[in-house]
């Protein structure tokens, strides 16, 4: 068993921790910083292209269920020209129902994210993206403070090191929500 095999797997003889499934009318997928230059970084434990593919798979499932997908990207204030590759990966932007531009590590501070989610009636967030211990965790902490139910798709996120990723996934995220593999994210009735 590898370090990442401890997460529940639907269809592996165990019930998903999300049973009986998520409500698509109350759930949104929030994708953090899936930008060209960030996805291209050397990441661990999941390579950037793998995180991207897994995140896009989640986005397809959310869109098929009628649940919103929100893509978040960072744009640092006071920097007249952002570094090359600062846009979202094109497929992420195309999959998103809304794009939120943040100016800090987390996606809620001084953005329209909370208002966007509340207008849609969202109470549960499935969070994915890069980096696990930075943008994902900062966003999750703020979401918890705002009383969102949180689900972390562990294989749809990564960090600069496996140790940083694992510290968030094993120590911090379970205090705020449920950590699962993306295969365990499903909607009620499916």
Regions found by a protein language model. Name each.
Residues 25, 43-71:
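A short alpha/beta connector and helix-capping loop motif
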């Amino acid at each position: 068993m590898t370090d990442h095999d401890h997460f529940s797997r639907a269809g592996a003889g165990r019930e998903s921790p999300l049973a009986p499934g998520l409500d698509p009318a109350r759930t949104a997928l929030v994708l953090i910083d899936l930008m060209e230059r960030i996805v291209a970084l050397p990441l661990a434990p999941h390579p950037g292209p793998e995180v991207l593919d897994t995140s896009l798979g989640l986005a397809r499932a959310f869109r098929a269920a009628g649940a919103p997908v929100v893509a978040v990207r960072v744009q640092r204030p006071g920097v007249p020209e952002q570094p090359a590759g600062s846009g979202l990966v094109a497929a992420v932007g195309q999959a998103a129902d809304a794009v939120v531009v943040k100016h800090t590590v987390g996606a809620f501070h001084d953005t329209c994210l909370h208002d966007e989610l509340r207008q849609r009636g969202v109470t549960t967030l499935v969070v994915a993206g890069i980096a696990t211990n930075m943008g994902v965790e900062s966003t999750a902490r703020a979401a918890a403070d705002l009383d969102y139910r949180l689900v972390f798709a562990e294989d749809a996120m990564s960090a600069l090191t496996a140790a940083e990723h694992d510290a968030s996934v094993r120590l911090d995220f379970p205090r705020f929500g449920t950590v699962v593999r993306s295969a365990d994210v499903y909607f009620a009735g499916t």
